[in-house]
């Protein structure tokens, strides 16, 4: 047995899922973000456990992470947050992964791959409402770009999503952060109204993470994405007193030895620590 190890408490994760569900509206789906090896908690084991708890979908950074989930036995939808490049197109179809699309060129290439394979692939389109990262810029013509993607053969635009710039609401910046979140959400609603006016129906709209779902319940839309809160992270400076999350990870080590050190003695290489 190693002298140091990490333990992951699945009961803590279960409690955290229960806590998050307690402030979700009826019918709102739950997507568990498990990128980065499930935040270091184990990308093979934790998602399987979350699936047994009834989580509706998973989010990862790129296709190879999605493959790990599939090979571990996960069957629920897996959304890729990052861009999928051409050398990973095959993985989308072989492992039933849902790419994030935010430009026509990428969409067209994946559409061609779908047609070549005789398949239809579910995709989500991301829009930039203020984070200034990935996503179609919200400006004149955004609706038309999305409609162009929706009309491409072999693609089914199942969802449209965005990410908040700062939903954690920092202490001392409550007004600024709240206004930004509401502004971003209103942009999403406006786009949804524009598309529905044209008869375009999208089944899954999502922008809220754990903090937003709790602090701004109107932003929950069709699905909420949860990440670090699954594992016990403090998700906002203004957490309600009746809400808490349990840390799922603990680090353990066995003591190797204890030895005294004289005054002005040194230890470790390069004498970097002095008493």
Task: Please state what every model-predicted region is.
Residues 252-275:
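Functionally critical, mid-to-C-terminal surface segments that flank or help form catalytic/ligand
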Residues 2, 36-48, 113, 122, ...:
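Active-site loop/helix belt of alpha/beta enzymes
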Residues 64, 82-87, 104-107, 127-129, ...:
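Short, acidic/turn-prone active-site loops that include or flank metal/cofactor-
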